[in-house]
Structure formats: structure tokens, C-alpha cells
């Protein structure tokens, strides 16, 4: 046995009582009992305590073992150690005296990772993406060990700011670190349904739902559809892209707008009997089922409660799913108090669609980065289990919702575009342009009739970008991308999320593909009977 130092092999003396690896007892063929495993655990702990040359706190070793045990179960369960939370600060946050950072995190493999950005907040314009790993807060390392602890520690006075240092792994494998100055604020509940508009003369309506975390999502959708129906709504594009989910109840109520009373929306299953549940449409007597053709748009950012909606409408042949495979995250979680005042937040069940598809995708034996990267790359039906809808169509499971109409791969932003966003070049230019052009911009309705910025403004932006070290290619494709980005940015800066999403609906090629699929959606058999 030896060490290689500077290319030379230096022999090490081995004490007679040290057991060599090759001399160690062979692992028994029979399965080990839990008692034997616990014995081994105790022996390993004692060997470290007695023989390791460093002074290692036994408590730290045990906490690391517990964290590793929970992490081995799944990437979403976690332990909240006792005395980690600040009760006074938590109460101030819950009562509204303090405001949160409008970015939610999950802990995967012990690391805080962005789950979603609250719609209707300034943070949506900061290029913060799901899967970005939080490295530091105001230059200091992250000390929080749970999502709750992190939320409380990041809270502060209204409109105060905090700098989040994020690490992003791009599609090409390169890693970039980004500093984002995020203002603390609470999202506007109305931002859950920021856009509900007619988009053509054929009676096509476009509605976008950005979250199910608000309290009135289903009611806001109901009111929006009532208004659109009075304007001639005959068919609907329901956009759930980048909707990270939220309340299962709100999701069930949204699906219930389009399904008959009593129809199954989801089923929940776990080891304990009390976890088992069947979510069905429960609708007030004065609300009727809406029967027009529907296309639901999804992508890899569609997760959790939004997957429940998409899956229910697909399984009942009530809507055609157009876009990209969804993220594949839908777990039931519950907190359990422990004797010392700490707690474990544990996955206790899985959610299935009406025909039995498990929404949660595989998470074992992969890294945090792979967990998010694979959500964007999973486009193949090979090996995916299938089930049959109410009307006899085959739909695919295996994690997430697989679309009926699969669009081209979600395009990776070219380097120049990624740099424009990451370096806040677009945000800086748009602010100045809107301030100088507030009179000429007019109303949102007027802007939407021709959603574009003048050629002179595009040329001015190119010059400004060059001064920031970003050269925008001079070709037709880049020009088109730049024009769409600037038009959307101007509308969002001038009229908020409603403006930005409205422009996107009119210029987005994926929305146009969804509109083309509406004729096919009209041939579906419709909602099946409750099962």
C-alpha cells in the first residue's frame, strides 16, 4: 500500500492490527437485518470517534447521517433542525409586517434550487430560472437547511432588496454565476390570470394562468371566461407554460370549469390509508360546464398543480395538449414534529391522473443539475408506460404530461441573447425607452394592433448593447428574435405582466401552433363520465 507523491511511490508501514481491505470479512450473501445495519452504523460511528485524528463533533456526524438518510429517500424531503427558525421573524412574515423575496426554493440534494419566481413581481424580469442554484445571499454563504428557514431568513422590510448569487448550468454544459438584486414584495393575487384576450376573428381566446398559488385562481379564470364568452369566445387556448403549480384545490376547480360534476381530476396514493384520496369536480349549481374546444399549452416549466389540470383534461379527452413534456413533479408532503423540537417534512404520497399516470418522474441516482436538465430533455415515448383516455386514445406516463402535439425542442437561447438578459442590457435599455416614449406608446390595445418597436429604436438598442460588450448578429433570424424581445420588454415595462404576456401571445410561434391544433381539439370525444 502506498501514496504517489511527485510521481514517486512512497511506501507506508502498515501496523499488524490494521485490517487490509482485501482481508476484511466478505459481505454476507443473505440480506442484512435492520438490527445488523444499526450495529454497523454504531461501530462506524465509534471507530470515527476513537481513531480519527481530527476532533469531530459527534452531533455533526449524526446530523450528517440523518441528512444523508433523508436524501437517500428522495430529493424533496428534508429535516428542519430545532432552533433553526426565528419564531419572531416568522410571525412578522406571516402577519405581513415583513415581506418575502418573491422567489421560491426547494432543497434538492441539500442545495437550495430555484423552483419558481412569483408572477406579477419585478423579479420576473431578472432572468431567474428554475434550476438555478443559490450560492450566496448578499455575499455570504447560504446557511439555511430548509425551504422554510430560507424563506424566513430572506424576508425583510417592504421594497428592500437582497442580492442573490445564483449558479446556472447552461445547456452546453458551461456554468455561469449571476448576481441578481431582488426586491422584497408580495405578489399581486390578480397576476395569476394576467391575460385573457381574443386573438383572432374566428372566436379564439387566449388565457394564461401563471400560478396556482393564489387564492382566487379558479374564480379569476371563471370571471375571465365569462367576459370572453360575451365577446364571442368559441374556442380556447389555455397557456400553462412555466406555471410551477400551487394549490391542488385551485387546480381541481380550474379543471372543473371544463369537466362534468363528479369527474375525477386526480387520485393520491400513499402508504397510509388516510393519504389515499380522489379529487373530483365539485361545482356550484349555477356554474355550468364549458364545452368549447380547448388546447392546453405546456412546457418543461409546467409542474405540480398545473400538471394535474393538463392531465385531467387530457385523460377525459376534454383538451388537446400542445407543446413540450411537463416537468414531472407532483408529490404529497407533510411535516412531522420530532421529540427535540425539530421536524421532518416528508414525501407521503404520489399523485396520479384519472387514468392512472404517475405525475412524478424518476429522481433516484441523479444529481440536482440532471434532475432539472432531464426535465427539458425528456422527449422520447420509448419506455414510457401508456394508459387509455375516456375516448380510447393512448397517452403516455412515466413522469409528467406528454403532449398530444409535440413541438420542436425548446430552443436554447443563443449566447448573445443569454448575455443580453444575464447582464440586464435589455432591462436597462427598455426602461429608458419607455420613459422617453410614454406619450407615443399610447394604450396597450393600440400597441397590440402592431406589437413592434420602430427600426430606429432597434438600431439604437444594437448600439447600446455594443457599448455593454454584447454584439447582436446582423441577420434576419436575429433581427426577428430581437424585435420580439424588445416589443415584449417594452409592453411589460409599460403595462406590466398583462402587456408582456399579451405581446407574447400575438408573436409567439408556439401560440400559433396551438391555434392551428384547435380544429383537432374540436374532434375529441369530450369529457368522459365520472369513473
Could you tell me what each predicted segment is?
Residues 45-54, 65-78, 136-139, 155, ...:
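Sec-exported extracytoplasmic/periplasmic mature domains
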Residues 358-359, 363-531:
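Conserved functional hotspot residues or short segments at active or partner-binding sites
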Residues 11-26:
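Signal peptide processing junction and immediate N-terminal pro/mature segment
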Residues 50-115, 159-195, 266, 504-515, ...:
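Extended, small/polar residue-biased N-terminal targeting/export presequences
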Residues 300-303, 311, 315-322, 327-401:
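Acidic, polar loop-rich interaction surfaces within structured domains
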Residues 22, 26-27, 32-37, 46-58, ...:
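Cleft-lining beta-strand/loop regions that shape enzyme active-site pockets
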Residues 2-13:
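Hydrophobic membrane-insertion alpha-helices, especially the h-region
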